[in-house]
């Protein structure tokens, strides 16, 4: 008997697929989805995947993600795909792409960096230097952020 995963289709919204296993809750937190006031959200974790071995999937009804939200997701789930659903059909499907530059989303770990000075109005800016493993560098002081640092900052863990 073939086993199937049954999750209700959404009429309009976003499906985030190919999230690395165990990171779906972080994606929800990143998007500010608590489940208390939001529409229908389906969360499936540790689903078998040919590409990843295991993966997570998030379905969000009634919401299309902004570019900034997709950029944030790419930093914690670089293998994810974003499917926009309209009238029960996939209107568009694309893989997330790591942004080459990130401004105002991450903070520098160097306490002496100008971006951490309370009297300076300087937004932290980072440049992508490696996709695998994920590493970014502060444009002001040269401090490196590793994938673990980025995930921790974006998910508040």
From Swiss-Prot:
Q: Which HAMAP family match?
A: Asp_carb_tr_reg
Keyword set includes Endoplasmic reticulum: no
| NCBIfam families reported for this sequence | ATCase_reg
Which keywords has UniProt assigned to this entry?
Answer: Metal-binding, Pyrimidine biosynthesis, Zinc
Q: Which GO terms describe its cellular component?
A: aspartate carbamoyltransferase complex
Describe its function.
Involved in allosteric regulation of aspartate carbamoyltransferase.
Family statement drawn from the similarity comment of this UniProt entry: Belongs to the PyrI family.
Top-level division of the source organism's lineage: Archaea
Q: Which organism is it from?
A: Korarchaeum cryptofilum (strain OPF8)
Q: How is the cofactor bound?
A: Binds 1 zinc ion per subunit.
List, in alphabetical order, the GO biological process terms annotated in this UniProt record: 'de novo' pyrimidine nucleobase biosynthetic process; pyrimidine nucleotide biosynthetic process
Q: Which GO terms describe its molecular function?
A: metal ion binding
Please report the name of this protein according to its UniProt entry. Aspartate carbamoyltransferase regulatory chain
The cross-references to Gene3D superfamilies, in alphabetical order and at most eight, read: Aspartate carbamoyltransferase regulatory subunit, C-terminal domain, Aspartate carbamoyltransferase regulatory subunit, N-terminal domain
How this chain assembles, per its entry, is: Contains catalytic and regulatory chains.
Q: Where does Zn(2+) bind?
A: 108, 113, 138, 141
